[in-house]
């Protein structure tokens, strides 16, 4: 995608999975789709980007009620166990049957630490929900699109 205007071309984006589409069936905590029990890593590296979007797709509940707590965490290293929550970057919702939703939030990566994690926590007694999320990173790469020429006539 390119945007032309003001004598510059701005382009550049990357889309990567924050959590692959999965069916959550128990009360658990994930960091970018990985259970913290099974190791660290898989953080979204913000170094190449100026800003990013985290888009969350919570599908239909196949049970009575569940609470999904999604929050963005930041860390200087690719280790979610030492990450801290970003203030105001949370998506908490009560879900009922046939109530699917799509949520998104924009984050200025220049103001955060290097790695971002989507922390997803499912709470409830009978949980079955289809869930997925993506990170979309963007950085304008600016290039001149015009040159001023002068002619001696």
Cite the ranges covered by each PLM segment:
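C-terminal interaction-tip segments
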Residues: 1-19, 123-153
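Solvent-exposed, flexible loop/coil segments flanking beta-strands in beta-rich domains
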Residues: 1-47
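Short amphipathic, basic-aromatic surface patches that mediate peripheral association
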Residues: 39-44, 55-62
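Noncatalytic modules at the cell exterior or secretory-pathway interfaces
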Residues: 50-53, 110-127
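Extended, low-complexity, turn-rich repeat/linker tracts enriched in Gly/Pro/Ser/Thr and Asp/Glu
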Residues: 59-67, 78-79, 123-128
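Beta-strand signatures of extracellular beta-sandwich domains
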Residues: 69-73
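Solvent-exposed serine/threonine-rich low-complexity stretches and specific carbohydrate-binding patches
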Residues: 85-96
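Exposed aromatic-hydrophobic patches
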Residues: 100-109
């Amino acid at each position: 995608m390119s945007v032309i205007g003001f004598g510059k071309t701005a382009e550049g984006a990357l889309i990567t999975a924050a959590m692959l589409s999965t069916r959550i069936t128990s009360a658990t905590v994930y960091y970018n789709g990985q259970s913290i029990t099974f190791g660290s890593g898989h953080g979204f590296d913000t170094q190449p980007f100026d800003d990013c979007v985290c888009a969350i797709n919570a599908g239909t509940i196949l049970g009575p009620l569940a609470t999904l707590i999604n929050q963005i965490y930041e860390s200087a290293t690719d280790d979610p166990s030492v990450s801290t929550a970003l203030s105001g970057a949370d998506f908490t919702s009560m879900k009922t049957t046939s109530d699917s939703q799509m949520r998104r939030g924009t984050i200025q990566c220049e103001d955060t630490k290097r790695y971002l994690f989507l922390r997803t926590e499912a709470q409830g007694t009978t949980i079955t929900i289809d869930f997925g999320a993506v990170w979309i990173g963007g950085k304008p790469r600016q290039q001149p699109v015009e040159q001023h020429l002068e002619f001696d006539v």
